Amino acid sequence: MHAVINTLRFKEPVDPTLFERAERELAGQMRAIEGFQGFRVVQVADDQVVLVIFADAAEALDRMATELGNTWMGANVAPLLDGAPERRIGPVIGSVSV
């Protein structure tokens, strides 16, 4: 399993409805990408969120960035950001869940 961690810094306080819309509008497309495992949005400051996306392989994460990141995120999120997202990707080397 691999994960990508995107740190997004916004110009203004984050509007949570933006990510509620992302859930509604992108869930089907995310699930359609082979290897997709999950998507989480964590608000870490008033003007900052961290996206954590899990997939079987890095290639699925790259595909998500190309197919969803460059379109929906580019149109709906990028104009609100205070700079380019910080993106890190790598293998998951430990995990515990319920």
Predicted regions and their residues:
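Outer-membrane beta-barrel domain signature
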Residues: 70-78
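Short S/T/G/P-rich N-terminal loop/turn motif that feeds into the first structured element of a domain
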Residues: 1-49, 56-68, 80-98
